[in-house]
């Protein structure tokens, strides 16, 4: 499920560290979190959609690796990010 352009731009603007920032780990994690939330809602309705479930697991793994990278580089930045996203860690 792709993210529509308006939503994507809003997320990028909210989590960007500077103007024109689309690739920072914060932005990437925020976009992945949005996609994960969408897929989670989809799977609540379509419980037997195993292809989407695998995609969800891949997205969660990618987000976990990015969060580990941020935590390794700057622990305060990591804590702010998970607090803003409402992730439980």
Curated annotation (Swiss-Prot):
Pfam families in the record: Ribosomal_S15 (PF00312)
Protein name as catalogued: Small ribosomal subunit protein uS15
GO process annotations (BP): translation
Keywords: Ribonucleoprotein, Ribosomal protein, RNA-binding, rRNA-binding
GO molecular function per UniProt: rRNA binding; structural constituent of ribosome
GO CC terms of this entry: cytosolic small ribosomal subunit
Chain's role: One of the primary rRNA binding proteins, it binds directly to 16S rRNA where it helps nucleate assembly of the platform of the 30S subunit by binding and bridging several RNA helices of the 16S rRNA. Forms an intersubunit bridge (bridge B4) with the 23S rRNA of the 50S subunit in the ribosome.
Organism the protein comes from: Thermobifida fusca (strain YX)
Family to which this protein belongs: Belongs to the universal ribosomal protein uS15 family.
Record-linked HAMAP family: Ribosomal_uS15_B (MF_01343_B)
Subunit composition and interactions: Part of the 30S ribosomal subunit. Forms a bridge to the 50S subunit in the 70S ribosome, contacting the 23S rRNA.
PROSITE patterns, sorted: RIBOSOMAL_S15
Domain of life the protein comes from: Bacteria
InterPro entries: Ribosomal_uS15, Ribosomal_uS15_bac-type, uS15_NS1_RNA-bd_sf
Coiled-coil annotated spans: none
Designated gene of the protein: rpsO
């Amino acid at each position: 499920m792709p993210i529509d352009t308006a939503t994507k731009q809003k997320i990028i603007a909210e989590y960007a560290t500077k103007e024109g920032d689309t690739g920072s780990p914060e932005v990437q994690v925020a976009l992945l979190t949005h996609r994960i939330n969408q897929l989670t809602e989809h799977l609540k309705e379509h419980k037997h959609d195993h292809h989407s479930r695998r995609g969800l697991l891949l997205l969660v793994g990618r987000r976990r690796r990015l969060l580990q990278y941020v935590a390794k580089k700057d622990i305060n930045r990591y804590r702010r990010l998970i607090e803003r996203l409402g992730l439980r860690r």
